[in-house]
């Protein structure tokens, strides 16, 4: 219903099932959908099924029925603030409209809406100034920052589907993943594939090569070569890859293609289908990527291997806990239980104690039941 948290270079989001981890990541995707090319407020709300689906089930009349996002950003010596409040339009259309849009730079107000123009023509409130190039010139760094948000949650079954004919642009689940790779400038793509190939040789037994080839219909495919008893490596395409190999390829691509200028990479449970040895080094791999591209990384996880990385501190772990009035978000470092780390407990041990359901006997009863 209401969450407030700081984001540093990295943030690891943990919590039980249905605590809101995906929804928390979606805050950043929502702002990216507004600021991004071809997006906007109406697009961002519609993509999520309407304003009623975006607001918390526990919200009731919280914030007078408004959806409110309030973000503070540091850019060198400058501090920006962007606040957006959205409500449903009164009347038949019930379109999402801007209730408030505020921008400040170093506490100096740059924009406040509604203004006189909005009051004279209320249709203007169906769009934010954030999404309009002609209107966001004075706070373009905010729009650029949100536009660089990238989300990764590759679904191998979607990539393998041979019947796919229509793909969604920038689909985080992978329907256009190989198309995106193929559309990259050849020299850049080949350089990135070489970097990925070296990583995959270390992580996947027998892996030898990775390339993109077009079939007779012009559709691009990932082609991997695997060493075997023959002199030439055997070739497989994405339909033959394991879930883990596909997700690892996607994860490497997401990391390598991030721009050098600051941005945000959102990863949802990146450990899925990956070997525990690979999962264990993911924080180090991501830390290396952050050093080379100056990005913030926010990921949700259930993996103790990730949380127990020696480089992770309690102020990088955001804990979501379910209450009778919605989920509560707190940094692990702010909780008294963090002192258990000084006694030798690992971060995953402390987190498990805080988020584990009180009673799981219902699961055993369900497994034992017979009709």
Describe each region flagged by the PLM.
Residues 1-4:
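Pre-Walker A adenine-sensing motif
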Residues 9-49, 248-254, 284-285, 300, ...:
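Phosphate-binding glycine-rich loops of NTP-binding sites
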Residues 26-94:
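Conserved P-loop NTP-binding catalytic core
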Residues 74-214:
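Electropositive, glycine-dotted interaction segments
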